[in-house]
């Protein structure tokens, strides 16, 4: 399957796994916003530390604005392969197109490391 129009870079599996774990940790010890509407609000306010977007969103237009908005606000974002992975890591029993870490809690070190690696990927 071809990459969706909103996927701006390939996320290595190891980095995707690290982001999934950071999202789980932030869900347990910090604050996580779930769902595209909430994520959009936190990006617009500049309060998101890291945005996680699923690669399998259909229709793609649901999340197509998120990378553009995040770049505009200089907020890092990363992709996970499925909505179920994003939803599960965010503490949901269903999939979600996107989530964001607002307060990293115990995942602060991991988030900083992920942000560095994302910057390298986007170069």
From Swiss-Prot:
Q: What does this protein do?
A: Multifunctional RNA-binding protein that recognizes the K-turn motif in ribosomal RNA, the RNA component of RNase P, box H/ACA, box C/D and box C'/D' sRNAs.
Keyword Oxidoreductase recorded: no
User: What GO terms describe the biological role, i.e. biological process, of this protein?
Assistant: translation; tRNA 5'-leader removal
Give the matching InterPro entries.
eL8/uL1-like, Ribosomal_eL30-like_sf, Ribosomal_eL8/eL30/eS12/Gad45, Ribosomal_eL8/Nhp2, Ribosomal_eL8_arc
User: Could you give one GO CC term from the UniProt record?
Assistant: cytoplasm
Subunit text: Part of the 50S ribosomal subunit. Probably part of the RNase P complex.
Alphabetized Pfam families for the sequence: Ribosomal_L7Ae (PF01248)
Q: SUPFAM superfamilies, alphabetically? A: L30e-like
Q: Keyword Ubl conjugation, does the record have it?
A: no
- Where is the protein situated, by its record's location annotation? Cytoplasm
In its UniProt record, a GO molecular function of this protein is: ribonuclease P activity
Give the UniProt keywords, A-Z. Answer: Cytoplasm, Ribonucleoprotein, Ribosomal protein, RNA-binding, rRNA-binding, tRNA processing
HAMAP family associated with the record: Ribosomal_eL8
- Name of the protein: Large ribosomal subunit protein eL8
Protein family? Belongs to the eukaryotic ribosomal protein eL8 family.
Give the source species.
Methanobrevibacter smithii (strain ATCC 35061 / DSM 861 / OCM 144 / PS)
Q: Which NCBIfam families match?
A: eL8_ribo
- Main localization category: cytoplasm
